[in-house]
Structure formats: structure tokens, C-alpha cells
Amino acid sequence: MEISSKKGIVSKAPYELFMLFTDMRNFVAMLPEDKKEGVEADYDWIHAQVQGFNIGVKVTERVPYSKICYADDGAPFKFGVALHFNPSFDPYKTEFQIVVDADLNFMMKAILGGKIKDALDKVVDSLVDMSEGRMPEGIDPSMFGK
């Protein structure tokens, strides 16, 4: 099942966004302190214990400044995620999109399909907002001051 987010114009150049998402340790650095326990990462992978499940994600492909692909690495189901960093009309902006390919059974597709799309769209909207200096609702700005 392939699910694509909407496209958003992020106020950062493609290379800036690419560099943020290429190193999995950056994801840990963005977590609040109380969520970092049980999370381990290096440049190519991240593993965490979430509600009793071991979940891992690894980088499978890096196309400099245009695409990064991730895949499950010990998750309860198979999935892949592709982040697309396309040049925009402005060299200091990026058209950003997330595409998820998840191996879900019929029931899980029915339950989660729309929720995954909504979550992906929210991530894109939040990234756009943050790139323009607006902190998305529910995000604590102090998380980014460290």
C-alpha cells in the first residue's frame, strides 16, 4: 500500500533539508529528553522500544540532495519511506514530499490508511511552518534550543 503526503514548499534549500534527514542521530537529537530512553542511533539506523515493540529504521538509499529512502529494520511489519527533496522555483526553497510503502493487511489498511496520510500531511505542514519561523501546534519550542 503506497501513501503519498501532500507536497509542501519548505523555506530551506534542498541540501539543507537533505543533510538534516540523512543522519539518523539527528532524529534522536530532536526528541524531548524524556523520550530518548531506549532509543539508539548511528548514521545509518535508529532503533527504539515503543509500547513494548522493538522498532528499527535504516537508511537504504541516499541520492544527494534529492531523495533519502528508509526501510524497516526489525519492525512488526514491512515498510519503506522515501523523502523527496525537489528544487523549487526559488533556489532557497524545496518542494518536499513523503511517500510510504507499507505491507499492511486489509484490516490494517482500512483502519490506518487515512490516519497515515493525515500524519504525513501534518509532518509536511509542520516542516513548512518551522522553516518559516512558526512553531506548529503541540510542539514545544524549547526542544530546539539545545
Feature locations, PLM:
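Soluble, non-transmembrane catalytic domains of enzymes that act on hydrophobic metabolites at membranes
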Residues: 1-2, 7, 75-82, 141-146
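Hydrophobic ligand-binding cavity/cleft-lining segments
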Residues: 1-40, 146
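Intrinsic-disorder/low-complexity, polar/charged segments enriched in Ser/Thr/Lys/Arg/Asp/Glu/Gln
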Residues: 2-7, 45, 54, 67, ...
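Generic structural detector for well-ordered beta-strands
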Residues: 7-11, 58, 84
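Hydrophobic pocket/interface hotspot
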Residues: 17-21, 27, 59, 70, ...
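Glycine-rich portal/gate segments that line the openings of hydrophobic small-molecule binding cavities
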Residues: 28-29, 38-76, 145-146
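Beta-strand/loop substructures that line and gate deep hydrophobic ligand-binding cavities in soluble
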Residues: 75-125, 129
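Short, highly charged C-terminal tails/helix-capping segments
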Residues: 125-146
